Amino acid sequence: FLVALYTFR
C-alpha cells in the first residue's frame, strides 16, 4: 500500500 510508505516518508 503506497499510503503506508507515504506515512513513513
Curated annotation (Swiss-Prot):
Using the record, list the residue span of the signal peptide; answer none if the entry has no such feature.
none
What tissues harbor this protein? Expressed by the venom gland.
Q: In its keyword annotation, does this UniProt entry include Disulfide bond?
A: yes
> Which cell locations does it reside in?
Secreted
Query: What domain of life does the native source organism fall in?
Result: Eukaryota
Which keywords accompany this UniProt record? Disulfide bond, Hemostasis impairing toxin, Secreted, Serine protease homolog, Toxin
**A molecular function GO annotation:** toxin activity
Does the record bear Disulfide bond in its keywords?
yes
Q: How is it modified after translation?
A: Contains 6 disulfide bonds.
- Where is it found, in Gene Ontology cellular component terms? extracellular region
UniProt similarity note: Belongs to the peptidase S1 family. Snake venom subfamily.
Which purpose does this protein serve, as stated in its record? Snake venom serine protease homolog that may act in the hemostasis system of the prey.
Record-given protein name? Snake venom serine protease homolog
Which organism is this protein's natural source? Answer: Crotalus atrox
Lineage here is: Eukaryota, Metazoa, Chordata, Craniata, Vertebrata
